[in-house]
């Protein structure tokens, strides 16, 4: 990802592709963003429209589904990049205007840029622009973001759909967690220490008493 973003910076599209990898927006949603959609102070991005191509013309329409209308929290670094990008064209309401037309980017043009970035970064995998959305989701789950939160960020209609989509990731994480728990249980049983006293009845949750090892 580091090499990919370096190439995006060279190409002059770092803010756009950084935002994509840190928010997982759909391509049309990303291209339809306007400056007024960003709350700089709260670091919140409002997603409520998309760019599509209909009969050869670019058109701004409502999002894919009602769940696609959402607010997405951003990192400070992402906000800083967006502010810097806007300062280059302060009179244009579009967050990512096409340098050629000043209007919205064509979805196909952005996909072609993605291929160029991949090639220049030496990434041989066939990564479509939509796969950047999957990359974000994979990083989020691997970083410990719960599925319900991720689902709302992606604009999915249910957490169950998100879980089904990324079940291979959560399965790997579960196996990793099982190994950690197994190692912990082995160390506990090997220690053969006496059980600590029972916790008070008013405890909010009940667990099998254990002694912290290490």
Predicted regions and their residues:
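Short, small-residue-rich loop/turn micro-motifs
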Residues: 49-51, 78, 86, 154
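Short, basic (Lys/Arg/His-rich) helix/loop patches that form interaction surfaces
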Residues: 3-14, 23, 72, 84-104, ...
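A general lysine-centric signal
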Residues: 49, 64-66, 148
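C-terminal secondary-structure termini that scaffold catalytic or DNA-interacting sites
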Residues: 42, 55-80, 84, 100, ...
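Catalytic-site neighborhood detector that most strongly recognizes the C-terminal catalytic loop/helix
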Residues: 51, 154-180
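Basic, Lys/Arg- and aromatic-enriched nucleic-acid-binding interface segment
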Residues: 1-33, 40-41, 69, 77, ...
